[in-house]
Amino acid sequence: MKILIQLFFVFTISILYSFQGLNIDKNNQDWIQIFNGNDLEGWKVKINGFPAGEDKFNTFKVKDNSLVVSYENYDHFKNYFGHIFYKNPYSNYRLRLDYRFVGNQCKGGEGWATKNSGVMIHSQSPESMEINQEFPVSIEVQLLGGIQKPWKRTTANLCTPGTHVNINNRLVTTHCMSSSSETFYGEEWVNLEIEVNNDSIIKHYINGKEVFSYTNPIIGGQYNTLKDKKGDRLKEGYISLQSESHPIEFKNIELLILQ
C-alpha cells in the first residue's frame, strides 16, 4: 500500500509538471514576431521632409537578421529624423526587443542625438504625419547609450512628443524624464520590454528589471500636430523605431497581445 501511494504521488507530480510545461509553451507561442529578420515586410518608413513610404537614403535595412538604422548614404544629416512603423495599431500588449548602438554618429547630427534613438508607442500613423514633421505624436521610450565614463546616461527613459502623462497621480508636462536604469557604454545588446495597458499604466523594463512607469497618456504639449485632439486620451496607436542620426540595430522584435 505504501508503494502504491508513493507511485501515485510521483504520477501526480509528473502530470502537474507536464501541464506546467504545456502552459509555458503556450505562453511562448503567444509572442508574435513582427520583424521577420529577412526583410521589412509589414513596416513603413516616414522621414522628415518626405512622404510616408519614401526612404531616399535607404536608412532602414536588414542585415544579419537585424533591423539596421544606417547613415552610410548620408552626406549630412540635415534633420532627416525618421521612423519606421509597424503596420497595425495596438492597445494592450507587451513589446520586447534587443537593441545596440554601433559606430559613429552621422555628420550633422545634433549633439544630444549621439547614441540616441527611441521606440515610439501609441503613435499616430505615418500617413497622418505632415511632410515636414520631425516626430509623430506619440509616447517615446527613449534609448540612450553611455558616451564616456563615469557620466551616467540612463536608457528606457520617457519623452513625450505631442503628449503628456501622469506620474504619481500628477500631470507631468516635462518633455523628457530619466529612468532608473544602469548605463550601457559599449556596443552590447540590451533587452528592452514595454508593457502597454490602453490609456492606463505603461511600464519600461531593461534586461528584465522595471525602470519606469506612468499612467494616463493624453495628447498635448510640444510637437503636437493634432491640435483638434488636444486633451484626448491615448488608448492605442502604432509602434515605430526611430532614426535620430546615430546608427542602431534592433533584433528579436516580438509582441504579446494582452487581454
Model features per residue range: what roles?
Residues 1-26:
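Bacterial Sec-dependent N-terminal signal peptides
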Residues 21-259:
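Carbohydrate-interacting regions of secretory-pathway proteins
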